[in-house]
Amino acid sequence: APIVSGGYDF
């Protein structure tokens, strides 16, 4: 999954 703004990746 892409790393979103915030720095988490589910």
From Swiss-Prot:
The protein's Enzyme Commission number: 3.1.1.1
Q: What's in the keyword line of the UniProt record?
A: Cytoplasm, Hydrolase, Serine esterase
- What compartments host this protein? Cytoplasm
Instruction: Indicate the principal place this protein occupies in or around the cell.
Output: cytoplasm
Instruction: Give the source's domain of life in one word.
Output: Eukaryota
| Listed GO CC annotations | cytoplasm
The residues the entry assigns to the signal sequence are: none
Example of a GO MF term: carboxylesterase activity
Catalytic reactions on record? a carboxylic ester + H2O = an alcohol + a carboxylate + H(+)
* UniProt family annotation: Belongs to the type-B carboxylesterase/lipase family.
Identification of the protein by name: Esterase 52 kDa subunit
